Amino acid sequence: MKFFFEDRVSIRRNYSSFGISIHDNISYQAHWHPEFELAYVEAGSLWVGINNNRQKLAAGDLAISVSGDIHFYDSTDLDSRIILLIFKPEFFGLAADWPDTRQFAASFFKKHEVHDQIRTALYSLLDENQNKHDYYELFIRAKVIELCAALLRFLPSYPGVKEHKNSVSNLELLQEVLMYIENNFSEEITLEMLSKRFKVDPFNLSKAFNSVTGKNLRTYINTLRVAKAQSLIQTTNQPIINIAFECGFNSIRSFNRANKRLTGQSPSATRSEVSQKQQK
């Protein structure tokens, strides 16, 4: 399993208004953003969650996250390779919330539903972005528009805009909760505290959170904490106990337990690996 933080950093580092890349065994925590995101499974299989739906996708399948969708990728105990495309529609002359006048009938599409023209446009984008042929920026602009047209032409969709139900499962509420957690995960965060802050019943919040993120609150927070800790272990000489407390763990024991569960090894083992690589 490729660790979540590594995927998160590599995607953000290479991404501006457009980004396309290949990821092996990606596991990426539930998140949301205003950009359009498409994941095409080249090989193997993985779990993908989008809003309240979670499916296991295989080679040839496609997943689409439109602006504001909460989504995650999970390759735990699986092997997968995906092409991940993220772009700002407005950068290409489209509405920021494209598709703005239609709604895709689903977020997941099986291999037989993915037309060859969609695959061709996607691989052409990957080639132009990787090899930087002459005038590749213009070709990328043209191919993004071609891909969007192919998605609308060949995937089932219907007129209308995306609507959120006025309930605790409201994605806008969960977006706010996720943003708060990401900005404050090193502090003490409990279900009761979140329910008071966002004025929602704790049972309903917990149920909606699990449904959308695929994890309970504690595991989600610990994943963020361990991700930051891994970065600090690999890039600083801070004592591990200091890192544990800085990332929000209240004891070295709880840090060791969470780190081993999520990465498969202890923090000290991670540091030893880093030291050995630096000495080579």
PLM ranges: what are they?
Residues 182, 188-226, 238, 244-273:
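Basic/polar phosphate-binding segments, predominantly the helix-turn-helix DNA-binding elements
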Residues 1-22, 65-134, 148-160:
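A hydrophobic/aromatic-rich effector-binding and dimerization subdomain
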Residues 176, 224-228, 277:
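Alpha-helical structural segments
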Residues 1-58, 62, 75-77, 101, ...:
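Generic protein-terminus/edge-of-domain signal
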